């Protein structure tokens, strides 16, 4: 789970990698944060009830947009599982998410504004309702370890692969794949082991992008 790529999805039943676009949701949060700061600044100057109501309405509208996006994204993912005859849905979870990482203020703001725990709860409910097994696993070390090199998913002083520019991950043998796809395979390996890894055919370099409608807060 992330911001620009809201969810990265891989399976052990097909050579298919899917990224659910998160930029529309990100833009909703950016617009909300910008307008919220403006209204709060006006409130400090005037203490007016009208501005207070504006802030409440803005927040309600933003929350409704976010919740609607999460519902549609979770429905899309569970639908993909059923379509591909997946019986277990594995989701990576970071206890502190990514706020503890040294990121820009804007990125931190985006992470704080996206209720990933709510999204995971929606996924759990919808998947179990369809008879799927739902597993939540800590995603620590999954972004640094090389999935296609079958590197053990744990801390290493030196890693065999490396994340490089433009969100790409390079394996020990120089194979390039999307960094989020690499992390997703490692999340799956934490639960299912190395046997789930498919032969690499280049699909991880250019995964399929899915969009959850067009969102705007304006």
Annotate the PLM regions.
Residues 1-2, 170:
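Well-ordered beta-strand positions
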Residues 2-120, 197-218:
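Substrate-contacting helices/loops that form the catalytic groove of nucleic-acid
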Residues 108-218:
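Positively charged, low-complexity nucleic-acid-binding target-recognition regions
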